[in-house]
Amino acid sequence: HRIVPCPDCKLQPEWMNALARRACALLEANGIAPYDEETGKGRVRHLYMRQGWHSGQRLLCFVVNGNGLPNEAEICRTLQQEFLLTTVLINRNPARTNVILGRDTRTVLGPGVIEDTLAGVPIQMGVHEFYQVNTPAAELLYAKAKEFARLQPDDFLLDLYCGMGTIGLSMKPHCRRLVGVEVVPQAVEGAKTVAAHLGLPPEEADFYCMDAGEA
């Protein structure tokens, strides 16, 4: 990869562009260098931002080559206050790879997740869970998928590669049982939490952490 300036991306909310510019200025002021894939040196690999479409809640995660940032508390608090962030996290990724996220994430400020709804399903998400970036389009696709499925009250619905389970859970009122399969542990736990929040016992909606090809 080559790092190039992109101060005004048209595909994301303007606050994300403004935060990226401000964060880069703070990092430079603190002498914190960006990560270089070729040398494996430098601290900051990515700025990872999310926003709940309906809730408006905002998440920021620094993906770092190391355990954290110099002056971490001050930098994170400044950005949280200036951009009304719901939560700020640090993800540790020391591997020589172009994979974005590492395994270890810790919360610096806030609850560690943001909340939103998707097709009427309440969700909580951190950084590891897959989330459609265009929520209105996703909700239209969910509705079309439900129409094509033509579910009946006694049907068994298998949701493969289910992520947080939003597709299956949005269709659960129209079938007898739902089983979701997903390889990301955090997403599976999130799906189970949502199902419990909706009052669905495991015998009606359950989720398994495994490879869908082996399910």
Q: Where does each model-flagged region fall?
A:
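SAM-dependent transferase fold signal centered on methyltransferase-like domains
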Residues: 1-106, 143, 147-154
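Rossmann-like S-adenosyl-L-methionine
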Residues: 71-82, 86-215
